[in-house]
């Protein structure tokens, strides 16, 4: 009989001292992918606006050690386990570590509104299970791996915040640009006369 698969779903936040580092997410994903392959760990990492949700599964000792390392990593703060337990088989046996930039999801219809408000630290067990179910469904039915659709972008947390604000308020900003151009035209005509 096979040993049960141990899993942890946890949330954390990016430490403020890494907000301007444009490579921190890419480095986290590369490091996680490599280490997970070595230790037989599978799962995924979702991130958005400095918040993380990670699901890891594998042999109990490997998962416990990995989670201990994550808690000591200075890039993570406010680490909190949302779900923990065992199951008969892996949910994501082909994913050494899929990293998904949820900010890329804003304009996509690929996933449901489960991700509309990505704030895992406020989620209870039901919401966390709903998100796991959504990712599992996508994993089983998508022809394109999730991280190929939403790859990590080489941009800092501050850059992501500015991009999100610009996307959210693009109509207002376009109107302001139109007013500025009109004012410049009026000023230019007045100045020339």
Residue ranges and their predicted role:
Residues 1-193:
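Charge-rich, low-complexity N-terminal segments
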